Regions:
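Contiguous, glycine/small-aliphatic-enriched amphipathic segments in soluble metabolic enzymes
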Residues: 1-143, 185, 189-274, 278-301, ...
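Small-molecule pocket liners
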Residues: 38, 142, 159-160, 168-171
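A broad structural signal for alpha-helix termini and local helix breaks/kinks
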Residues: 54-55, 149-153, 177, 206
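Short, flexible loop segments at boundaries between secondary-structure elements
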Residues: 147-160, 164-168, 296-312
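Ligand-binding beta-strand-loop-alpha-helix segment within the catalytic cores
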Residues: 163-192
Length: 349
C-alpha cells in the first residue's frame, strides 16, 4: 500500500474520557474539516454505544487494517483490539479495569505503523494514574512510545515533546517530573540532546532548512548573572554555546516572561523551556483548541491532541474535536514527507 493511501492509527485513549466522543465528532466533520482517513483501535460495540448515547448519527464499521480507507467515507472504521477485549466505561469515572485495553490500543497502533499498515500514530488522551495503579512503569504516553520504538535489548530513543500550533511551538526540556527535581535533571547534556533532536526533526519532518531555536531561562530574569540561581549561567548558557558551535541557530537563555509575546515569537520557530509548565502555559493560552502534541526523536510520526481526558465534561456532548482534528491533519502532513521514510524502525534495521 502506498504511503499516501495508508490510514492513520488512532488510539482509544481512556474510554471514560472525551477521546471516544471527539473521535466520533472528528469523523462527522471529515468532509467539512478535511479530516484524513483514520482507523480507531478499540471495541466497535463500545463506539456504537457511545454514538447512540450521545445521539450522534455515526455508523461504526469493524474493519481489517486494509479496509479502513475505503470504509472511512461511509463509516467510522474501528479495528478491534488484538486480544478481542471488550470495553465498558462510564463517562467521567475512570476505571482500572480498562487499563489493559488502553495500553493494548497504543501498542497495536505502533504495530500497525511498524508493519506499514498505517502511516502514523495519533493518540487519544489517557489518565496516567489509571495505568500506574496497575503497574504501568512509564511516566506517560511519550516515554511508553519511546520504549515501544526501541530495538529489543537496546535503550529507547530520547523522546522530545513538542507542542505545535500556527502561533507558537514549544518544547519542555524536562517533562513529567516534579518541579523540585528539575534543577538536578536539567543537565547540559540533556539540553544539548533535546535541541539536536528538535533541530533535526524540524529539518526532516517540518521542512525548515535553517530552524531558529530559542531557550528560555529557568530562573527569573534568566538568573540575573547568577544572583537568582546559577543554572542559567552554569548549565543553559554553556549548552547554547556548544550548540551554536555545531552550527545550530539557538539563542538563550532568555527571560521567560518576555519570550512569548507576538514580536518575540516572530524571531524563532521553536522555544525550548526547562520546565513543563513554562512551555505549556503560553501555548495553551494562545491555542488551547488548536494545539497539537508532536513527539520528536521517534522513528515514526506521533501526534495527539493538546489536552487531557477531560473527565469533568465526558459524556455531555460538549467536548470540542478541534485539537484532535489538528493532530490528525498534522500527522498526515508529516507522514507524507519523504524524509520520514528514511529512518526505519529499529527492529527492521
Amino acid at each position: 500500500m502506498a504511503s499516501d493511501d495508508r490510514p492513520l492509527a488512532l488510539t482509544l485513549g481512556d474510554p471514560s474520557g472525551i477521546g471516544p466522543e471527539i473521535a466520533l465528532a472528528a469523523w462527522r466533520l471529515r468532509g467539512e474539516r478535511g479530516v484524513p482517513p483514520f482507523q480507531l483501535i478499540g471495541d466497535p460495540e463500545f463506539l456504537e454505544a457511545t454514538a447512540y448515547r450521545l445521539g450522534l448519527s455515526v455508523p461504526v464499521a469493524e474493519v481489517e487494517p486494509d479496509d479502513a480507507v475505503e470504509v472511512f467515507a461511509r463509516a467510522l472504521p474501528v479495528l478491534p483490539l488484538p486480544s478481542g477485549a471488550k470495553v465498558s466505561a462510564t463517562p467521567g469515572a475512570p476505571d482500572t479495569a480498562n487499563a489493559g485495553a488502553i495500553v493494548e490500543s497504543i501498542t497495536a497502533a505502533v504495530d500497525l505503523v511498524r508493519s506499514g499498515a498505517a502511516s502514523a500514530v495519533v493518540t487519544n488522551p489517557i489518565a496516567k494514574f489509571v495505568l500506574t495503579r496497575v503497574g504501568f512503569a512509564h511516566p506517560g504516553h511519550t516515554e511508553f512510545l519511546a520504549a515501544l520504538a526501541a530495538r529489543e535489548g537496546r535503550e529507547p530513543p530520547l523522546p522530545v515533546m513538542m507542542l505545535w500550533s500556527e502561533l507558537l511551538a514549544v518544547v519542555p526540556v524536562t517533562i513529567h517530573v516534579a518541579l523540585r527535581r528539575v534543577p538536578d535533571l536539567l543537565t547540559q547534556e540533556l539540553v544539548e540532546r533535546t535541541a539536536r533532536i528538535v533541530h533535526a526533526d524540524l529539518r526532516a519532518r517540518f521542512g525548515l532548512e535553517a530552524p531558529r531555536l530559542v531557550l528560555s531561562g529557568l530562573n527569573p530574569h534568566a538568573g540575573e548573572s547568577g544572583t537568582m540561581g546559577t543554572e542559567d549561567r552554569d548549565v543553559l548558557a554553556p549548552a547554547v554555546a556548544a550548540l551554536r558551535a555545531e552550527g545550530i541557530d539557538i539563542r538563550g537563555p532568555l527571560p521567560a516572561d518576555t519570550l512569548f509575546h507576538e514580536r518575540a515569537r516572530a524571531t524563532y520557530d521553536v522555544a525550548l523551556a526547562p520546565t513543563h509548565d513554562q512551555a505549556l502555559i503560553p501555548i495553551k493560552t494562545l491555542a488551547f483548541d488548536e494545539g497539537v502534541n508532536v513527539t520528536l526523536g521517534l522513528p515514526f510520526v506521533r501526534t495527539s491532541p493538546d489536552h487531557g481526558t477531560a473527565f469533568d465534561i465526558a459524556g455531555k456532548g460538549v467536548a470540542k474535536p478541534d485539537s484532535l482534528i489538528a493532530a490528525l491533519r498534522l500527522a498526515q502532513r508529516l507522514a507524507q514527507r519523504p524524509a520520514n521514510n528514511v529512518t526505519p524502525f529499529p527492529v527492521l534495521a
